Regions:
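Amphipathic alpha-helical interaction segments
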Residues: 56, 102-103, 174
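Core segments of small alpha/beta cavity-forming domains
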Residues: 12, 17-97
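Short amphipathic beta-strand and strand-loop transition segments with alternating hydrophobic
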Residues: 101-112
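Short coil-to-beta-strand transition motifs
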Residues: 95-99, 149-152
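Exposed beta-sheet edge and beta->alpha loop/turn motif
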Residues: 1-9, 111-186
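Arginine residue identity/basic-tract feature
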Residues: 20, 32, 90, 104, ...
Length: 186
């Protein structure tokens, strides 16, 4: 089962895909679904979908606003900021052709132990055929040392419902911390 952020409402006027010459723009940003505040599997699902959409949006724009609003733990937010080139992306100095993160759920339902839920996933990171850094175009190989056009990573999302919201961690399990958005020209 794919975690489908397409089920969510997005706002924005439409967009232009990134090219080798120009960074994409006009990306629609996720709109927070009401179901996120529910203490239910559906609430957890929509919270995860919102965070997933926020990750892809940040990879394209450098804006991590929706990640901050998503219920992702501070630890996972810090990890993401350390491995993604958000500032360079915001300044138009770095972009990838794609920059999409898609989570595929390992089961139809999360496992619950006490107050903690766990949900296995397979993450597909779509980087595309190229990235641009400081005006220089770099072709992305199929897969080299854990980085390439499409990269897969398995992990388990862990979540608790606290104070009327989902707190989630484990978004980037299994990702080499020096590879996401930080390719070969370090």
């Amino acid at each position: 089962m794919e975690l489908n952020n397409a089920d969510m409402e997005h706002t924005g006027e439409g967009y232009m895909y990134s090219t080798r010459e120009k960074q994409g723009y006009g990306w629609s940003h996720p709109k927070r679904p009401q179901e996120m505040s529910e203490n239910s599997e559906l609430g957890l699902y929509y919270s995860w979908a919102y965070a997933s959409a926020g990750i892809s949006y940040a990879m394209k724009t450098g804006d991590d606003t929706y990640i901050k609003q998503s219920g992702m733990t501070e630890g996972d937010q810090k990890l993401f900021k350390s491995i993604a080139l958000l500032e360079e992306t915001r300044e138009g100095k770095y972009w990838e052709e794609s920059g999409n993160f898609i989570y595929r759920l390992g089961s139809d339902h999360p496992e619950k132990k006490g107050e903690e839920y766990s949900w296995p996933y397979r993450l597909q990171m779509f980087h595309g055929d190229f990235y641009v850094r400081n005006g220089e175009v770099h072709e992305i190989p199929e897969n080299t040392d854990g980085w390439g056009k499409i990269v897969y990573s398995d992990g388990t999302l862990k979540a608790r419902y606290l104070d009327g919201a989902w707190q989630m961690e484990g978004f980037f399990e299994g990702i080499a911390t020096n590879t996401v958005g930080n390719p070969f020209d370090k």
